[in-house]
Amino acid sequence: AQRSPSLRLRF
C-alpha cells in the first residue's frame, strides 16, 4: 500500500 496525500484524507 502506498501512502498518498489523497488517501491521507480517508485514513
Swiss-Prot record:
Protein name in UniProt: Short neuropeptide F-1
Major localization listed first in the record, in broad terms: secreted
Tissue/organ expression: In larvae, both sNPF-1 and sNPF-1(4-11) are expressed in the CNS and ring gland but not the midgut or thoracic perisympathetic organs (tPSO) and abdominal perisympathetic organs (aPSO) (at protein level). In adults, both sNPF-1 and sNPF-1(4-11) are expressed in brain, cardiaca, corpora allata and thoracic-abdominal ganglion (at protein level).
Subcellular location: Secreted
Keywords of the record: Amidation, Neuropeptide, Secreted
Gene Ontology cellular component terms for the protein in this record: extracellular region
Organism domain of life: Eukaryota
Family statement drawn from the similarity comment of this UniProt entry: Belongs to the NPY family.
Record carries keyword Secreted: yes
Biological source species: Delia radicum
Modified residues (Phenylalanine amide): F11
GO biological process, one term: neuropeptide signaling pathway
Secreted found in the keyword field: yes
